[in-house]
């Protein structure tokens, strides 16, 4: 692999995801909650930023985009369907599009649910998924604009990617999401094992991300809608449809 990945903490619990393609010296960032922390890393490493990718319109993901673009000359890419709510786009994209960024081919995947017009960026060569606030570490984004069915479709689509894919979501929410998962299944040893690892990372000042998609499939309640143990934990009948299980889990999380 020729790609260096750096999660940059921003605001209270956000991440900007910076990557450097060492083969071509191409530098890309996904989401910019604020410009200053990203500029500091670029300056410290003497890197020139070339591209800014946006997942969705919420201010805690785009507030620093224009300042960073002006400071670096980087080109901005985001969903054409959401352009009216985004900073000016040099590259309006749609699901199914591919942007060639250095040696990487970044695929655009529809990720509606948290917001409408949300997209995810998938790098099959590097095995990286930048999911914004759709699929999150040990959770999923709250449904501000979309429906449970839309988010369920998004998660099903993302979960079909290779299990070794590393998920880079927009927030350091892993521990909080894990507490919810454990509230549903307090006897699940795999959940406790993951919480132990997350706790150790955070105590060491390290990010809990990225995480493999395989780990998410095994422990994230929102990716386990066909799991009998989760249905039982939610008090649902054994023949409950996966969408009903997901909807019940999301409603429970909203009240947690």
UniProtKB/Swiss-Prot annotation:
Substrates-to-products reaction catalysed: an S-(2-hydroxyacyl)glutathione + H2O = a 2-hydroxy carboxylate + glutathione + H(+)
Record flagged with keyword Transmembrane helix: no
Pathway, per record: Secondary metabolite metabolism; methylglyoxal degradation; (R)-lactate from methylglyoxal: step 2/2
Cofactor: Zn(2+)
Enzyme nomenclature, EC number: 3.1.2.6
InterPro entries tied to this protein: Clx_II_MBL, Glyoxalase_II_hydrolase, HAGH_C, Hydroxyacylglutathione_Hdrlase, Metallo-B-lactamas, RibonucZ/Hydroxyglut_hydro
Chain sites annotated for binding Zn(2+) 2: 60-61, 133, 171
Gene Ontology MF terms: hydroxyacylglutathione hydrolase activity; metal ion binding
Self-association state and partner proteins as the record states: Monomer.
Family membership: Belongs to the metallo-beta-lactamase superfamily. Glyoxalase II family.
Function: Thiolesterase that catalyzes the hydrolysis of S-D-lactoyl-glutathione to form glutathione and D-lactic acid.
Protein name: Hydroxyacylglutathione hydrolase
Gene, per the UniProt record: gloB
